[in-house]
Amino acid sequence: LDSEETFAWRMLSTLPFITLFMWWSGDLKHVTEIFRRVLQQPLLLLWLLISSFLCTTQLWLFLWGPINGRGLEVSLGYFLLPLVMVLVGCVLYKEKLSSWQMLAVALAVLGVGHEIWRIGSVAWETVYVALAYPLYFFLRRQFKTDNLGGFWWDLFLILPVAFYLGFVYSDSKALLLNYSHLIWAVLGLGFLSAL
């Protein structure tokens, strides 16, 4: 399976498991609460589509990078991400850091800065991971979808793309049928992703 097929099957198998988990934990109410809000404020659907795009492109990039030899660039974005989140917290939410936290941030800046210097450039994958997630989390907080229900909608709204990638774009369904152990791998991926 290539990165697009793996992404598709991950999305298709994660949603049922996360739905079961939310049902078991009593969190499905968040899904229906957001649905009621969409009925009252149809413009919220646009935000949910943007949220789904930001979230699922991150999930896709996480799979695409290593498969396509860009794992280091994607990983560097994940190392840079907490620093951007600290910056967002301090600037937008006026959070204060303790002396130990400032020391930790300074050491992280040194480590990540050294790696960027060693590589000699900042790839688009690094920038996307480091900036898109903070935007995603900020907007989810602003639109009050920062719960499992919001994530459920992110996955639900990407289903048409996942179905296309899994059933039209590729012949992966034939691969899954011919190698039945892959079905268990896909289900395991969905289960682990839902956790």
Predicted regions mapped to residue ranges:
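Structural motif at transmembrane-helix junctions in multi-pass transporters
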Residues: D2-E5, W60-G77, L148
